Amino acid sequence: MALAHTLGFPRIGRDRELKKALEAYWKGELDQPGLLQVGRELRRQHWQLQKDAGIELLPVGDFAWYDQVLAHSLAFGVIPERFRPADGQPTLDTLFAMARGVAQGCCGGAHAQEMTKWFDTNYHYLVPEFTVDQAFSLSWTQLFEEVDEALALGHAVKPVLIGPLSYLWLGKAKGGEFDRLELLERLLPVYGEIFQGLAARGVEWVQIDEPILVLDLPQAWKNAFERAYNLIQREPLKKLVATYFGGLEDNLGLAAGLPVDGLHIDLVRAPGQYPTILDRLPAYKVLSLGLVNGRNVWRCDLEKALEVLAHAHERLGERLWVAPSCSLLHSPVDLCREDQLDEELQSWLAFAVQKCEEVAILARALVEPEAPEVRQAFEVSRRVEASRRRSTRIHKREVQARLAAVRPQDSRRASAFAERAVQQRARLELPAFPTTTIGSFPQTSAIRLARQSWKQGRLSQAEYTEAMHSEIRHAVQVQERLGLDVLVHGEAERNDMVEYFAEQLDGYAFTRFGWVQSYGSRCVKPAVIYGDLSRPRPMTVEWIRYAQSLTGKVMKGMLTGPVTMLMWSFPREDVSREVQARQLALALRDEVSDLEQAGIRIVQIDEAAFREGLPLRRADWPHYLEWATEAFRLCASGVRDETQIHTHMCYSEFNDVIESIAAMDADVITIETSRSDMELLEAFEAFAYPNEIGPGVYDIHSPRVPAVEDMVKLLSKAAERIPAARLWVNPDCGLKTRAWAETEAALANMVAAARQLRQANLA
């Protein structure tokens, strides 16, 4: 029989118990013993849930108080000087300080470590900071404590570690450039110490995650794998190297040949690496096949998965293991909690607990195909697949016909930017260095209470509309008083930049308990795309029309772009991401056109996740960038030349996608640049970016009110790179999370800075 195991399990709890406990601890409402008890109870529950589902070898070490990479940094003694305790011994509070920073009132203050996306998921990790003289030592023994807990409960365990090469790859050199591979020999002894500690506890297997094996690796890093694992093999324990999020491709031979006892591959993201892997795998080695999708919410097609397993079982026998494609960290916890989804839609879904059951039933089907539980599970799977194939809620002829009728000219504006710009300037009559904001204004407790009361039926539609109108009036009055040139309505009615639109589109569904961890205590509940997407009615027009009626100044319409809508949702698996993005683009195109018809002269289409969608392998970039830019243009190109299209992007690297950003052909792009001191504009200058740009002049993530002179300096730097006639003045990002007092003060200074620049340019 193939062994059923998982690579990791969600840590947040069915009711987000970890989130609630962490936030209570940070507020001083829960002491550390209470927090530790919550962690112990969650681990106990999660191990039992997996065991009850039929998982035979349970992961230990997948629990983390904030992030698994950060936990490794603490374990390895990779603690930046600004956080290092005087006695050298890190504590739980050290970990939280590294993740969240330390306030100025404590020890002079210390900024948090950088956070970035975990490969191409929507999870974020804390980036390790390495110095050229970096020392490593076993400094945090949480893994040993958790192994002891699991063993005491009678579980068969498989501790989980991030591998040494992936850990170094995920970090950054600080205090000067150097090759992180130079640190490898210093790091490996700590792994040896951990392996020895686990062996002493009677552990047989350890899982070593090396997800960078699915990336384009420099030759030096490939060579380092062989060097590192030749040393690691001398240590006790059987070792399973786990890869996920993509195919091994040119690294397949390297991974298969590593001197370890097993290899896990992701057959959801990269089914093509099977059966090739069988011919490269040594005869002694276990092969773990990831056949159940660990990062989406759909049921597995059991018959299709069993075909692969049965073939592998003939070749491998007991050397075959079955698992999800990756850690279940990226899946919600338990579908059984859902009580408001309709029966048919719920039958199509599987969360982490159900995915464990699928893994276990697949393993059992190899040896007991006629067992009643196996036959029943496969019968349900067949019914689900048939239901999804013929469902008219999924497959809508009118949506498919409209998509098929799209012509190349539908993704192009009528005229080139230079011609459009002349018409837009004549229509908008804006001054040089026009000022605006990115869209959202502070979401106060009163706004949240009104929305909650309306959704719960305690506030009528008319009462809710008046409450939102009051907030819009306030936002418009503040902007007019401050002297901003292009106004926004403030987005008071929006709970989330994706969910607000998804709730109004056909083809989206929403769960009550489909939470996944984004980072630390931050959890998100992505909408689920289950079918063809369309817009039954206008989504924003009445709010924006009302806002425009309050002022003679230009009011921007605000939309979330098709790529961002897709990337921040659980997508369908039966059609490509490209098709889903184009369906979203057509739905949003209708909204853009309706805004134009309502007299709105500027429409902003945010694409915050445009870069996040990039595939892990460079060879796959061109196809993604082609359809992602086409989706944006399809969404934005149905308007007249005099209507100005804006987009907003907030990330720190443009050089490698600048051509595609230009190909989007937005009239104005606003970007996050203040923290880089305008250095990000180098990419736009070098490329000779032809359209208009609004480089962010202050960091909205900080409560600090920027000085006028600081913003004047930044704008002057920007004007050295971009012609002044094409520069806009705006914050880095939306102001949803800020308070009104600091927002007004910062915007007043921003307007003053723009006026100074205008006077200087006229002089």
UniProtKB/Swiss-Prot annotation:
* Record field: catalytic activity: 5-methyltetrahydropteroyltri-L-glutamate + L-homocysteine = tetrahydropteroyltri-L-glutamate + L-methionine
What the entry lists under InterPro entries is as follows:
Cbl-indep_Met_Synth_N, Cobalamin-indep_Met_synthase, Met_Synth_C/arc, UROD/MetE-like_sf
Q: Which cofactor does it need?
A: Zn(2+)
Q: Which GO terms describe its biological process?
A: methionine biosynthetic process; methylation
- Please name the GO terms that the record assigns under molecular function: 5-methyltetrahydropteroyltriglutamate-homocysteine S-methyltransferase activity; zinc ion binding
PANTHER family of this UniProt entry?
5-METHYLTETRAHYDROPTEROYLTRIGLUTAMATE--HOMOCYSTEINE METHYLTRANSFERASE
Q: What is its EC number?
A: 2.1.1.14
Please tell me where L-methionine binds in this chain.
438-440, 491, 606
Regarding protein family, the annotation reads: Belongs to the vitamin-B12 independent methionine synthase family.
Keyword Transferase annotated: yes
Pathway(s) the chain acts in: Amino-acid biosynthesis; L-methionine biosynthesis via de novo pathway; L-methionine from L-homocysteine (MetE route): step 1/1
> Does this entry carry the keyword DNA repair?
no
Known function: Catalyzes the transfer of a methyl group from 5-methyltetrahydrofolate to homocysteine resulting in methionine formation.
Name listed for the protein in its UniProt record: 5-methyltetrahydropteroyltriglutamate--homocysteine methyltransferase
Record note on cofactor: Binds 1 zinc ion per subunit.
The alphabetical list of record keywords is:
Amino-acid biosynthesis, Metal-binding, Methionine biosynthesis, Methyltransferase, Repeat, Transferase, Zinc
Q: Which domain of life is it from?
A: Bacteria
Q: Record-annotated residues binding Zn(2+)?
A: 648, 650, 672, 733
Where on this chain does 5-methyltetrahydropteroyltri-L-glutamate bind? 16-19, 117, 522-523, 568, 612
Active site residues according to the UniProt entry? 701 (proton donor)
Instruction: List, alphabetically, the HAMAP family matched.
Output: Meth_synth (MF_00172)
